Swiss-Prot record:
O-methyltransferase that catalyzes the 2 O-methylation steps in the ubiquinone biosynthetic pathway. The gene is ubiG. It is an enzyme of class 2 (transferase). It comes from Salmonella typhi. It comes from the Bacteria. This is Ubiquinone biosynthesis O-methyltransferase. HAMAP family: UbiG. It catalyses: a 3-demethylubiquinol + S-adenosyl-L-methionine = a ubiquinol + S-adenosyl-L-homocysteine + H(+); a 3-(all-trans-polyprenyl)benzene-1,2-diol + S-adenosyl-L-methionine = a 2-methoxy-6-(all-trans-polyprenyl)phenol + S-adenosyl-L-homocysteine + H(+).
Length: 242
């Protein structure tokens, strides 16, 4: 990784944002480009809810919320949810869908670093799903998430491992063969090995609690969580108590 870090206000890849801006209007189309996100969301939500001891009454931040799929589902569980994203169009879609659904979610367009400077230790749960591989400095995002969570609070990350298998499955398979996501969605060079993510976590008040893989079976066309972090994986961390 480039040792020259982007400034806090510019930890943004505008090409990445443009990708999602272009398809934002179809974020809630269950048969569109975001179909995989809709399909894995129950698994993500179940993992977050179980590992955090329930979301009801908790203050939750969803970093890189996009069109609000996870944010809305956490709000339905009784959480007070704030969604952060740097994409204007996805946030507009998220706001409109929440209004149509009668779900209250606060959506904010700013970086997680900017948010951390104003809202340190204010959240019971912070989620950062499929976002780290889309920013220039994922380490900075991890640090900001750690600053935002309350002592004893939970932080969840999900991303893609960087190896030949993940390139084959997430890029060649998902983008070109099965066409589950648009071509160019992923750049294998930006994928993150679990050891790298854990090393960034260790630089903060966060401590690893659990890690699991997210697996897709093309034969049965099903997703499941389980051992093995070769491709997609989720990490649960907890902030040290004061």
């Amino acid at each position: 990784m480039n040792t020259e870090k982007p400034s806090v206000a510019h930890n943004v890849d505008h090409n990445e944002i443009a990708k999602f801006e272009a398809v934002a209007s179809r974020w809630w189309d269950l048969k569109g480009e975001f179909k995989p996100l809709h399909r894995i969301n129950p698994l993500r939500l179940g993992y977050i809810t179980e590992r955090s001891g329930g979301l009801f009454g908790k203050k939750v931040l969803d970093v890189g919320c996009g069109g609000g799929i996870l944010a809305e589902s956490m709000a339905r569980e009784g959480a007070t949810v704030t969604g952060l994203d740097m994409g204007f169009e996805p946030l507009q879609v998220a706001k409109l869908h929440a209004l149509e659904s009668g779900i209250e979610v606060e959506y904010v367009q700013e970086t997680v670093e900017e948010h951390a400077a104003k809202h340190a230790q204010q959240y019971d749960v912070v989620t950062c799903m499929e976002m780290l591989e889309h920013v220039p400095d994922p380490q900075s995002v991890v640090h900001a998430c750690a600053q935002l969570v309350k002592p004893g609070g939970e932080v969840f990350f999900s991303t893609l491992n960087r190896n030949g298998k993940s390139w084959l499955m997430a890029v060649v398979g998902a983008e070109y063969i099965l066409r589950m996501v648009p071509k160019g969605t992923h750049d294998v060079k930006k994928f993150i090995k679990p050891a790298e993510l854990l090393s960034w976590v260790d630089e903060t008040v966060l401590k690893e609690q659990h890690i699991t893989g997210l697996h897709y079976n093309p034969i049965t066309n099903t997703f499941k969580l389980g051992p093995g972090v070769d491709v997609n994986y989720m990490l649960h961390t907890r902030a040290k108590k004061a």
